[in-house]
Amino acid sequence: MLESPDVAGRAASALAETMPAHVTRAAFHSIAIELPPGRLSSAEVAARLEISEEWILSRTGIHERPMAGPDERLSDYAARAGAAALARAGVDGSELDLVLVATISADEVTPNTAPLVAHALGAHRAGAFDIGSACTGFLSAVAIAAAAIESGRARWVLVVGADFITRMINWEDRKSAALFGDAAGAAVLGPADGEHGVIGPIVLGADGSNGETIMIPNPERKIVMDGPEVYKHAVARMAESTLTALDRSGMTIDDIDLFVYHQANARITQALGERLGVEPERVVDCIAHYGNSSAATLPLALASAERDGRLKPGARVVLGAFGGGFTWGGGVIEWGASGDA
């Protein structure tokens, strides 16, 4: 497992106090999202799959999802989400040291999406690269960004999670075809300044022995997924990484205000909360109107919770994700970003 630097204290009063004094603490300074205007309803999906809409709703909790048009480019949405996040953080693109884009649906195999986003935002001195760990991508990027800030190698980092997954739907597989949507979300990470919370321990893991359980093979580039196996491993791994991250932060389930997990489907989110003994009101569930947009679901969930007033400065938050590979992760943060997402 790859872990963020060891914390020094075990007190649950504040994550900032659990890190050595000489470490530059990293924090979220903003969150923003960008959605395609097109919508694909579950009624439309049901008609195409020749099943009932109720069948979809009962198994996924998804009523509709954003859907990009055939001529729209993922890099444009990633750049717009990034621009909104920069504006909300009061940071200019030229100040960025690093641009990370988590995606498995880039416009081209090469160049990566991140250099295109960096160019669009005027981040001409920033390093830029993509992270392809599927639905875990955004959390993986946050871990890398936090490590760069904490080590002094970067001050401002833009983290983007963006995917157009509807283009990869396998319409022959009704169990997975109803799940996916398109979206982009972005966050600006920088040094904690007392007003923007702090990023605590992030624990990442992977198991390639299950790689064929969910995959997008070449050249077909259509999703192949064993839903029951994904469900079983997703719940177990996200619960495990949540508890590990909490232990490393010196916190418990009761210390956390919100649990923000990858929005795979409503059943997984519900089962995860039940396994951890968390009341539903503390678990963010926004999949009904977004669907599963892979690397974009965590920023979507954070922005949704902030917009609804559930995510406030000072809130202690667990982040968790699970994706193809398998890859997974869990982390603990104190929130500080504010404003309309």
Which residues make up each language-model segment?
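Condensing-enzyme catalytic core mediating Claisen C-C bond formation in acyl metabolism
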Residues: L2-D71, D173-A236, E240-L243, F322, ...
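Claisen-condensing/thiolase-fold acyl-transfer catalytic domains that form or cleave C-C bonds
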Residues: L2-A8, S75, A79-L86, S105-A106, ...
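Acidic-glycine-rich active-site phosphate/pyrophosphate-binding loop
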Residues: L49-S58, E108-G122, W156-I165, E212-I216, ...
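Short glycine-rich phosphate-binding loop at a beta-alpha junction
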Residues: S94-A102, I253-H262
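Short, well-ordered amphipathic alpha-helical segments that serve as non-catalytic structural scaffolds
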Residues: S52, L74-A89, T113, H233-S249, ...
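Flexible, glycine-rich active-site loops centered on histidine and acidic residues
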Residues: A148-A183
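Short beta-strand segments
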Residues: H29-A32, A102, G132, V157-D163, ...
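Anion-binding (especially nucleotide phosphate/pyrophosphate-binding) glycine-rich loop
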Residues: R88, D92-H124
